[in-house]
Structures are given as structure tokens and as C-alpha cells.
Amino acid sequence: MDKQNIYITTTLPYVNAEPHIGHALEFVQADAISRYFRTKLGDENVFFNVGTDEHGQKIFNKAKEEGLSLNDFVDKYAQRFKDFCKLFSVEYDNFYRTSTPAHHDAAKIFWKKCEEKGDIYKKQYSGRYCIGCERYLTEKELVDGKCPDHKTVPEIKEEENYFFRLSNYRGPLLKWLDENKDFLKPESKIPELRKIIAEIEDISISRLKENLPWGIEVPNDPEQVFYVWFDALTNYVNAVGFGTDEKRLSEWWPVYSYVVQTI
């Protein structure tokens, strides 16, 4: 195998509850891949990232329920996940936390880059909001009027939020999929994925700060905070230098990479 950088990352678990066996499976799988490539390429060519997702409505509610400040609450559960990794002898290179100032700064840089490309706009929106999912659900996603995952009736909310023009990427994503048919196994699932991509809609990426004070403030708009998924997903590039160390970023991204995700 030729020498190359291998970047391995798990998803970032939410810190609204204790670690569980599903997290262990993901951490251990990623650790096994990391160890394998270290034997082939050496430690210097492998970077293994784990961490915790620490913003959003569920965390805000849970901290209030436990009578803790938000910072104390996320510190407590981030440490639980660190201890959990230690329990399973998971040897990561970086434990990434989305509540840190460094993450906030990098996420804001990412927002501004999206804005400069014309991918962000603001509009009034009304929809069915599931607190458990922390997102708006469409009519066709509901089962008997309820969220299929949380079995609750979504709240009807009306807000002015920022949206990401995800619909602009239907064409490029379909083209990429056509050119990389070995991306998905089994190939019989490609038509299903094509259908999902063809139906992509723009997504809400902010929330009113008066309703959710625990989040990253949107650049140049103190009344809005990042929607938790939009800020958390930037961790994968932030962890290897986006917004802070462009030289390091160029060494690890884009590279031959593994994203290990078990849900």
C-alpha cells in the first residue's frame, strides 16, 4: 500500500444522555480501522477523530432538567464519553467538542463561505417541528400525524430562519453518483438514492435565539443561532485545520478517508 494520509472519524454523539452500546460499536469499529492503518502506514499518516455534539434544544432542555448550567452540563457528559472510550481502550488522536471557541470560530467561517457562494438565504417558514429530531418534518414523513421515531405530535412553529440552498446540489450530486457507481453497495440501492437526491429540498439552518439561546450566533445576525446539525457537521473539516491551519487542512482534506458511522 502506498503511503497516504488516512483520516478516520466517527460521528459526534449528542451529550443529552449517557453513552450506550451503540456508541461503543461505532468507537470500537473506528478504532480497529485506525489500528490497522497505523500498522500499514505508521502513526504519522493516520488521524482518528472522535468527539461530542454539544448544542441544540435537547441539550438545553436536559441541562435545565438536571439543574446545571449549560457549560457544566456539556462538560459533564463530554467527560462521560471520554471515560467511555477509555473503558473500551479506544485510542483516538483528537477529541473534538462543538462548544469550544475554536469550533465556534471555524463554523462561522464556514457559514460565511456558504453565504459568499449564494447558498444561504432568509425566509419566513411554518412547519411541523419535532423537538426529539430537532428538525421540521414533512407531511409524508409523519405516521398517523406523529414523528415515526419519537411517537410524538410535532409542534406547529412559525419562524424567520436562514436556509441552505441544498436544491442547488441535486444535479452535481446525481452526476457524481453516475460517475462513481461503486460508491454504494449493493448497487441495487442506487435507484433509491437517486430518488432521494432528486427530491432534495432547501433546509433550515438557523433558529431564533430567543427560543434557543444555546447555539452558535449567526454572523452579523445576533437574533439567530446555527441549527445544531449545520454547526456540528463542520467538525469533520474543523478537526483537521479548517479555519485555523490551512497547511494542515491541505494534508488531510481531501484525502483517502474513512467515515465510520453506525446508527
Predicted features along the sequence, with ranges:
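Structured secondary-structure scaffolds
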Residues: 1-43, 47-50, 102-106, 157-263
